[in-house]
Amino acid sequence: HAVIIEGFAAYDDEDTLMARVRDSWPSAFDVRGEERLRGIGHYMSPKVWVGQFGFTFYHAATVPLNVGLHKDHDFCPVPGFREVHTQIMGFGKMQQCTERNIATLYLEEPMAPGQTHRPMYDDECNYPWHQFETITPSIFLAVEMLPEGAIPPNL
């Protein structure tokens, strides 16, 4: 499978584009209601499902972002959920930890436009604690892959 994002670099001014995004996308906290997202400059596009694949763009306006480490996705109770992130604009990093504590950081992958981090789930789709962190204001794409038998949620 492949995703092609046409025209992702076709804008005149990055700051103007990101301001337009903030004006049109709701905050991730307003959509998801997760306490770790409260008060953070983190915005999300409407999620689009194509079969078992979910696509959501996120605008990370706050530097640092501090969305908090997480490893579970409550909307998918079926084992086998997978997810990767692709940097679209700006610079960020995907951080992985052994515990829900940034002091246990064991891998930090810098991400530039067009880059997808390596899969961070094991053969049984278990995740480490992880978070996206900004280096600059950013837009990234989260691609969620549901296992067979899971029904895409209405988020």
Go through each PLM region and give its residues:
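A short, N-terminal "cap"/entry segment at the start of jelly-roll beta-barrel domains
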Residues: 1-59
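A short hydrophobic beta-strand segment most commonly corresponding to one strand
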Residues: 2-11, 128-153
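Feature captures hydrophobic
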Residues: 47-49, 57, 72-76, 119-121, ...
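A mid-sequence, solvent-exposed acidic-amphipathic segment
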Residues: 57-81
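Short coil/turn segments at secondary-structure boundaries
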Residues: 70, 98-99, 154-155
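Short, conserved beta-strand element in jelly-roll/cupin
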Residues: 79-98
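Short acidic-glycine-tyrosine-enriched beta hairpin
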Residues: 96-134
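A short, polar/proline- and glycine-enriched secondary-structure boundary/capping micro-motif
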Residues: 104-107, 151-155
